[in-house]
UniProtKB/Swiss-Prot annotation:
Extracellular compartment residues: 36-144, 204-214
InterPro entries assigned to the protein according to its UniProt record, in alphabetical order: TM2, TM2D1-3-like
Membrane spanning residue stretches: 145-165, 183-203
Tissue spec: Widely expressed.
UniProt-recorded name of the protein: TM2 domain-containing protein 2
Domain TM2: 147-195
Amino acid sequence: MVLGGCPVSYLLLCGQAALLLGNLLLLHCVSRSHSQNATAEPELTSAGAAQPEGPGGAASWEYGDPHSPVILCSYLPDEFIECEDPVDHVGNATASQELGYGCLKFGGQAYSDVEHTSVQCHALDGIECASPRTFLRENKPCIKYTGHYFITTLLYSFFLGCFGVDRFCLGHTGTAVGKLLTLGGLGIWWFVDLILLITGGLMPSDGSNWCTVY
């Protein structure tokens, strides 16, 4: 069929091509406008404040609205933060008072014997929370672990205690040499150290606690 000197099929084909080209141009304009809006305008918080970038690419929010889903970084659970080791003041009470936190001594057998202090913590990268991202987390025990295991030390004391191996491992070098020279105090010192280990009277010399075996 011919319409105005042109076949109808040719006109339909030209119309479809024009519609396809128009759709492509429209999609290109929409996607370009969306990408410009996403990069040019900063995301706003629920309170209307801009959201700057924090360290590690994490968003640093300002806490203002108590009904906002964004919480303070200091309220994050332990699995979302990383904390430093407690500060060791090595018995210097003046330094502890000036800093406001830290441990004068480490270790202890009972809960009441262990000091507790605050430590510096920060939110992990990628976790969105209201600043400040670095804060103090309280009630951390003054305990450290340096690789001493109770079972291993007890076996050393039982089988090699006459040669002072148990005290050498715990860092009590002076008494270990005396125990070695006297062959465990003719067996008396060997037996006494076994009792001290079991009752908690003989611990590592650096004030650390026994490592826990899970």
